[in-house]
Amino acid sequence: MNTDLKSPPAVWLHIGAGSFHRAHQAWYLHRLLASGDDRWTIALANIRDDAIPLLDTLRAQHGEYVLETVTPSGERQYEKITSLRNIIPWDKALDHLVAQGSKPETRVISFTVTEGGYYLDNQFNLQQDNSDIQADLRGDCRTIYGAISRILQQRQQDKSGPVTLLNCDNLRHNGERFRHGLLEFLALRGQQSLLNWVTSQTRSPNTMVDRITPRPSADIAQRVLEKTGIVDNAPVMGESFIQWVIEDDFIAGRPALENVGAEMVTSVLPYEEAKIRILNASHSCIAWAGSLIGQCYIHESTQTDAIRQMAYDYVTQDVIPSLTPSPLDLAHYRDVVLERFSNPYIRDTNQRVAADGFSKIPGFITPTLIECYQRGGVPTATAMLPALFFVFMESWHQGTLPYEYQDGILDPAAVHAMFQSSDPAGLFARDSALFGPLANDDQFEQLLRQSINRVSAWVSTNR
């Protein structure tokens, strides 16, 4: 471990200006600064233009904003976050981002671009036929691969030194999967020299991140003003719980994150499996189910007995046996997660959590389906989750969802065509992008059809 760096301060460049980064990674760096350790600061950037208003607001506030956290009992705390010292302007060519990323003082580049932002198929290879990937292979910067490859190419040319690439999304083996996608991207471009440089001059540790961070509500700025006296046009909110587990494999130094509560480990595997399967998959289950019966918020859906029972049964009957033995108390973790979801003060929306289902099923749910069959069992409880998503997307197809569904890899024409076919459930069950080897399994297809019927019947009696 090498945390001691001489001045000038090292820069942690983060790509992805959403609320989660500002409530999570930026908080840890802020706590280090508040403790007197000023060796690292953050530069914040975005790949797409949708964050321009936020970046402009943060720049006007000198990168400062207030984080509101709330406990399940309703206790709120407010903290002004000061770790964002450079807000990078967006430009279409990402020249400003590349300029910061290629500086020698930039020692870590982290990113949050959502699960779908890595464009990986169910074999975790790059989706070469995706239009954004194709554009980046031709030289654009629409994806994390296009942006990072430009930065690294400039670092190679400028001899700026090694850099750590840190994936902070809910992707299993997130560092390894990103690195595989990046190297495949460079190979497809024929950039062998850069590929060799990346292999020797970068590291990509796996991480596990956790803090429920809803989109800021309309009234948070007023609460911040009343409680702190600060006029903040870019506040964020989150639950009081926070966790960050990181494999300690940094090539160019790192902040002393263990001093502010991060867990530096040799392997994140047991942590990430528990989090992805228990927290993330249950979250999606609850959001899809709640949306189908007209509920808006995660807490009200979690407090609905039938929905809570679906999530509880999924974890208890199928996930815990799949992950046992584990160094974690999985039953306790299940109960803590459901308590966190029940927090009425977070007001996290089903719309936010229901998003990106086409990435979440293969990433969060299918591994448990497969392992249940491998143990000789039948994943009756787990099959309810993709069944919920099927009925959820059927509602989307019919135009009856109460909100706009957001999914980075959604193919609207293909989904509409599926539901217009003579056998939508069969096409869904045989989708190898969602279910991998189970897409050719008649037993699984029969189970999924039964589960879809169960969900449809439940929705019809509870809507």
From Swiss-Prot:
InterPro entries: 6-PGluconate_DH-like_C_sf, 6PGD_dom2, DalD, Mannitol_DH, Mannitol_DH/Oxidoreductase, Mannitol_DH_C, Mannitol_DH_N, NAD(P)-bd_dom_sf. Disulfide bonds: none annotated. NCBIfam families: DArabDhDalD (NF043014). Transmembrane segments: none annotated. It comes from Yersinia pestis. The keyword Oxidoreductase applies. This is D-arabinitol 4-dehydrogenase. It catalyses: D-arabinitol + NAD(+) = D-xylulose + NADH + H(+). Pathway: Carbohydrate metabolism; D-arabinitol metabolism. GO terms for biological process: arabitol metabolic process; D-glucuronate catabolic process. Belongs to the mannitol dehydrogenase family. One of its GO terms (molecular function) is D-arabinitol 4-dehydrogenase activity. Its EC number is 1.1.1.11. Keywords: NAD, Oxidoreductase.
